[in-house]
Design a protein with these regions (language model features):
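Sec-dependent signal peptide recognition
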Residues: 2-8
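Bacterial signal peptide processing site
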Residues: 19-21
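C-terminal motif of bacterial Sec signal peptides marking the signal peptidase cleavage site
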Residues: 15-17
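Beta-propeller domains with acidic blade repeats across secreted/periplasmic ectodomains
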Residues: 25-294
């Protein structure tokens, strides 16, 4: 019975992928191959989905023995710390403490089977998320932390981290939390408070919530990915998504700082501290030779 169920799930996954590709191709068959560009320039582009999208995932093999990643001339690579469960983001505190958010996408059912078929499951973890933050401290600066312990646990897919005004902020997928914090603490003991609710229902593949303080510390910027690949689940599911939001440190006065950003997973300040940079993962599976516009 178990084998029959697995076979059925595999077949369903394959058919779903094929049907999705054909549906998108049919929906876009009447769209023009030529689009208008600034200054009335004409740019020849293929129609969306004119070619089948192909993916090839990497296989994680880790380090063995004395092996190390190859570095450019003049650089070396060494292991700082290990034994993490999906270390997804790094935050370095003003005092030099290093915080690691351990979290990952959680998949189950047909989606999990599709990941196994495509090879995606071998390139990234997809089981239960660790949902914790680990602290590392290298007090003597020898490149090896003397302290490595769980700093905060029981979270919900944490990603962004920030220390501001005696608080430790965490960007969980469903909200911005803050905890009382004193410099040098190695564990959060106080009770936190959720100061901003963030959308996380339905399609939530873009679950990371990066945090960034304004240079003067008066604002906190929060990146929130879209609730879809390209709006296929309806615009009601995109409310407050595909944005960089900005709030006061107490979570009040929320505004949209930037919008139309499919998945702004990384945000930081340019060297001038006046321009916000965002690294955005744009839409997938359009086919060859097309810009990935969202």
């Amino acid at each position: 019975m178990k084998n029959k169920l697995l076979t059925a799930a595999l077949l369903a996954a394959v058919l779903a992928g094929c049907n999705s590709q054909e549906k998108k191709k049919e929906e876009n068959k009447d769209k023009a191959d030529v689009v208008s560009a600034p200054n009335n320039q004409q740019v020849d582009l293929p129609a969306p989905y004119a070619t089948k999208s192909v993916k090839k995932y990497s296989k994680v093999i880790g380090w063995t023995g004395e092996e190390k990643p190859t570095a450019p001339a003049g650089f070396t690579v060494s292991m700082f710390a290990d034994k993490f469960v999906s270390p997804r983001n790094i935050y370095i505190a003003p005092n030099g403490d290093v915080f690691i958010a351990e979290s990952n996408t959680e998949t189950k059912g047909v989606k999990k089977v599709k990941n196994q078929l495509s090879g995606k499951s071998q390139s990234q973890p997809s089981g239960e998320s660790a949902n914790r933050i680990t602290i590392l401290r290298d007090a003597n600066h020898d490149g090896k932390p003397e302290l490595q312990k769980i700093f905060l646990s029981g979270l919900n897919q944490p990603f962004g981290m920030l220390i501001l005004n005696n608080y430790f902020y965490v960007g969980n997928t469903d909200g911005l939390w803050r905890y009382p914090y004193k410099t040098g603490e190695t564990m959060i003991a106080g009770k936190g408070e959720k100061i901003v609710n963030l959308p996380a229902g339905g399609y939530n593949n873009h679950w990371t919530r990066q945090l960034l303080a304004s240079p003067d510390g008066s604002k906190i910027y929060i990146s929130v990915g879209s609730g879809s690949n390209d709006g296929e689940h309806g615009m009601d599911n995109e409310i407050r998504r595909a944005n960089v939001l900005v709030v006061d440190p107490n979570g009040k006065n929320e505004k949209i700082y930037a919008s139309g950003l499919r998945n702004p997973a990384g945000i930081t300040w340019a060297p001038d501290k006046k321009t916000l940079w965002a690294a955005v993962n744009e839409r997938d599976n359009l086919g060859d030779n097309l810009v990935p516009d969202y």
